[in-house]
C-alpha cells in the first residue's frame, strides 16, 4: 500500500511504502526552502537528485549531501535542511 504525505504547505511530498527488500521507506521531493523535521525512529536518508544541506542533531556544522550520498538521523530527534533546488530523496526507516 502506498501512503501519500504532504508537508510544509505542499513544498515537501513523499510516498511511503514497504517492501521485502527495503523494509519501510518513503521516496519524496523537496522544493527549495528551509525545513525542520522530527524523527520517531532512526532514519537513513539518501539523496537521489539535487542536494541537501543538513544540520544533524549535535553537529556543529552544516554538511552538504549530493546524489548517491547518505546520512543517518537518530530516532526521537530533529534535523534541519536547506534546499536550494528541487531535490529527491529516499528515506529508510531503521
Swiss-Prot record:
Any GO CC annotation of this UniProt entry: cytosol
One short Pfam family name for this protein?
A: Ppnp
**Classification via SUPFAM superfamilies:** RmlC-like cupins (SSF51182)
Main EC class the enzyme belongs to: transferase
Molecular function in Gene Ontology: guanosine phosphorylase activity; purine-nucleoside phosphorylase activity; thymidine phosphorylase activity; uridine phosphorylase activity
Report the EC code(s) recorded for this entry: 2.4.2.1, 2.4.2.2
What InterPro entries does the entry give?
Ppnp, RmlC-like_jellyroll, RmlC_Cupin_sf
Write the record's keywords in alphabetical order, separated by commas: Glycosyltransferase, Transferase
Quickly give the catalysed reaction.
a purine D-ribonucleoside + phosphate = a purine nucleobase + alpha-D-ribose 1-phosphate; adenosine + phosphate = alpha-D-ribose 1-phosphate + adenine; cytidine + phosphate = cytosine + alpha-D-ribose 1-phosphate; guanosine + phosphate = alpha-D-ribose 1-phosphate + guanine
Indicate the family of this protein: Belongs to the nucleoside phosphorylase PpnP family.
Function per UniProt: Catalyzes the phosphorolysis of diverse nucleosides, yielding D-ribose 1-phosphate and the respective free bases. Can use uridine, adenosine, guanosine, cytidine, thymidine, inosine and xanthosine as substrates. Also catalyzes the reverse reactions.
Cited PANTHER family:
PYRIMIDINE/PURINE NUCLEOSIDE PHOSPHORYLASE, PYRIMIDINE_PURINE NUCLEOSIDE PHOSPHORYLASE
In Swiss-Prot or TrEMBL terms, this protein is called Pyrimidine/purine nucleoside phosphorylase
| Species classification | Bacteria, Pseudomonadati, Pseudomonadota, Gammaproteobacteria, Enterobacterales
